């Protein structure tokens, strides 16, 4: 949740201060990538807004990023800006995903017990992304190709 405070000044110099909480994941400067999401599970699958996504190397299809995957999709490459509900087994859906920009890291959704740390492995966090307590700036995987494990 982000807290937004607005100050409105009236002609008589009195102030009205409005504070509201807004669920905001995507903050600014976001870039998108279009592609196809494919449900590779045996049953229904829901991709939530903020879901961390990976890309299958052989097919180029987007799937939920899972640290145990061996098909290339264990690398976090993008974030879903919307919910994809009840995708049936093997269903393919055209998607537009966020692959760069600033997002609220509290809004990220991971698979199972995965965390950002389990997905990026030994790569130093400050090399992979610029983070602070409220948000992080995603970089595409090509931007991090020169970084080694520490």
Feature names for model-found ranges:
Residues 1-150:
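Surface-exposed, low-hydrophobicity beta-strand/loop segments enriched in small/polar/acidic residues
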């Amino acid at each position: 949740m982000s807290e937004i405070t607005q100050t409105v000044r009236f002609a008589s110099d009195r102030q009205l201060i409005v504070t509201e909480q807004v669920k905001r994941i995507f903050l600014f400067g976001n870039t998108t990538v279009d592609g196809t999401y494919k449900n590779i599970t045996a049953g229904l699958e829901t991709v939530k807004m903020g879901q961390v996504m990976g890309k299958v190397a052989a097919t180029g299809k987007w799937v939920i990023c899972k640290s145990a995957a061996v098909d290339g999709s264990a690398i976090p490459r993008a974030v879903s800006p919307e919910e994809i509900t009840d995708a049936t087994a093997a269903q393919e859906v055209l998607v537009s995903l966020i692959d760069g920009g600033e997002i609220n890291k509290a809004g990220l959704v991971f698979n199972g017990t995965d965390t950002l740390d389990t997905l990026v492995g030994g790569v130093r966090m400050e090399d992979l992304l610029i983070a602070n307590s409220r948000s992080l700036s995603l970089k595409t995987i090509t931007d991090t190709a020169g970084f080694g494990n520490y």
